[in-house]
Amino acid sequence: SLVVINKHNIKTQDDPKLEEATTDLYSHEFYKGKMLNNTMEYAGMNVARARDEVKKNMLEQKSADIMLELIKPVKCRCGAECVVKLLSDQWFLNYSDPKWKSLAHNCINSMQLMPDEIRTEFDYTVDWLKERACARKSGLGTRLPWDTEWIIESLSDSVIYMAYYIIAKYVNDKSLHYNLNDAFFDYVLLGNGSAGDVAKSCSLSLDIVEKMRKEFQYFYPVDSRHSGRDLVPNHLTFFIFNHIAIFPESMWPRQIVVNGSVLMEGRKMSKSLGNIVPLRSAVREHSADAIRVSMLVAAELLQDADFTLDAVKGIRDRLERIYGLCKQFTKKDSTRLEQEDKWILSRLQHVVENTTNAMDRLRVRESLHNVIYTMDQDMQWYFKRIAAKERDNDSISGVVRQVLDTRVKMLSPFAPFISEEMWELLGNNKSITLASWPNVDESKFDYAADESETLIINLLADAQNIIKVTKIKPKKIFVYAAASWKWDVYRKILEMITQGKTNFGEIMKALVNDSNTSKVKESPDMVKKMIDDILSDPLDSRQRKVRLTLEEVKVFEDAKGLVGKELDSDLVIFNEDDKNKTDPKNKAKVARPYKPALYME
């Protein structure tokens, strides 16, 4: 309970978020909870299953009876309160049938569900579903063929409307008539019978019948069904049941994608709260692209997206900045690539790779975060580097143009309108909808550039932290890069850790026994720190560094202007090996690879 209270930041019993927190807690206990050891035969059982078992046992023992009760008032979409009536001789779909349930579970097991954690809810729904009314006495709908007093209830047939889409256009253009028989549907949807017999019995052209069958085979099975989480206990599970009852296994659904709802400023949209934003006015004020992106970037699939107008304005500003860059950088020519150019092009490949992987898993928020925020951060750093070296736009236009070209392609599925405009600004004559999703260019990965820029970023951050803590305003900052023998030690440790050897004693012994690294016997603390440095590094970074040799002094010299400008100080750079270095406080001795020492005065 405390975890949930902290998660929702609840301070008092009157907090309106308390109800939502309670629902979250009960839901978590119900779907994830296990029965305690003191519950006898139910011990260790899932709470959801235990509830049904307790009910079943109590009914069998005549210790309980069933009372039908509405959990809350039922209202029509027009606002009128509904009266629930029990009907006699009503028709039901028998979702209780154990064989049908078993097939439904088989279908779920063979399907891709996104996100995968929704699988538990589908299985649970299949287990508890029982007979469900499939017909009613009033309202719009199709008459039940074998009992015309009844009208087919919408959720009983609408869950296979994808199949109807195949023939809908032929109904609308009057190619089909009302004299369709069972043989027609058996052929078009199931492949039973012959096109010739169907055409003859229904007075249709052979060409139309064959065309509908081919189109059905093209579009079926359903590759992906997208809907809200609130439809898992009904529409989406009926979708599974009804498909497996009608179609062969080869035509069963392949994927279901479930999404959350959209909240407004952290609250559910409702008329009573007065927080509904009409779509037309929102688009008119903020643009369709900004609204689309702000909702998509707010949450992953199963989470509720918290829509705020401040977020929309922020997204719009970011999109307009990208648009401005597209107007500014149109030349394709690239001059000789500098260190920062190689870095931004390498970073671009990482973003393409990560975004593509995220999109393949329908991690839309993660994808947009890469394209919007990560690339913004990268470009801001790149332009800082450019400004510090006083490079003009002509010298970077080709590189920036490559970045924009790729970025706009990745942005287009989410913000199609402004992406089309930007694509044209970049000199493309055809629509961006005809452009391919960008591929990773392996030749532009530059791991030396990646690590070099990370080294500079970390140097700047370390210096800023020291200044913040000490509250000094240095006029001069001395940077000391690690001695060459320390690099030998670092590489040796890195190789051993990469091989799975992390024991300090084993590493120390290997270093002391190697003439190139034996100096470490006087510096065991440094070895411990290097081991910690390497183990705190992500695995992919370790693997890159095994193959790298960085000249730290050269890297720092290249960024001297930027770091000095950011810190408002003169930067003086030495190698620890330099006998003529200025080192009044003997700081150089603590320098380690990728961890330069600093002295300020």
Segments (PLM) and residue ranges:
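Structured, non-catalytic alpha/beta "coupling" segments that mediate domain-domain communication
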Residues: 53-95, 311-326, 409-425, 577-599
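Alpha-helical recognition segments enriched in aromatics with Gly/Pro capping
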Residues: 1, 123-303
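C-terminal low-complexity, glycine/proline- and small-hydrophobic-enriched intrinsically disordered tails
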Residues: 309, 313, 430-601
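Charged, glycine/proline-rich intrinsically disordered loops and linkers
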Residues: 2-41, 176-213, 497-547
